[in-house]
Amino acid sequence: MNIELTDTPKDQDEAFVIAQVQKYSSRFIVRDQRSLCVFARDGNGIMIGGLTGRTNWQFLEVLFLWVHEQHRKTGLASKLMAMAESEAIKRGCKNARLDTFSFQALGFYQKLGYQEVGHLPGFGGQHTRHFLHKSLCTGA
């Protein structure tokens, strides 16, 4: 047996491990992962905001949300989130999840109805990572 520790793994080695986990998991749940992105551009076609995420297992997972500093506090981030949530519901999602750091937008997400389900302190020695959930079911 040979055990290797590396910070420069071969792409095929990483892909193999991921594929094996997915193969095992597929016995229990159908994998239906699809990208879901929303982009906002100004009149010149310059990106001023964007959301990247995916839907899978009836969940919307928001990975990144960004709005250019000049366009913050204008409601743009809320529009991006609403569009993503609406599309996720059309795809059959019942829940949404995301995480954010203490120096990012915890209060913003809470105003949108996200509830903290956990947190981990100590990132970079001083920051906390917050994990949030929101039900996308009507009336919930």
Give residue spans per PLM region.
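Conserved active-site tyrosine of GNAT-family acetyltransferases
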Residues: 17, 109, 114
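Conserved GNAT acetyl-CoA-binding A-motif
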Residues: 88-101
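Conserved acetyl-CoA-binding loop-helix of GNAT-fold acetyltransferases
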Residues: 73-86, 111
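Conserved short alpha-helix immediately C-terminal to the canonical SAM/SAH-binding motif I
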Residues: 80, 104-105
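Short coil/turn segments at alpha/beta junctions that flank glycine-rich nucleotide-binding fingerprints
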Residues: 31, 74, 91-94
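Acetyl-CoA-dependent GNAT
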Residues: 3-63, 68, 103, 122, ...
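Conserved catalytic-core motifs of GNAT/GCN5-like acyltransferases
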Residues: 97-99, 115-131
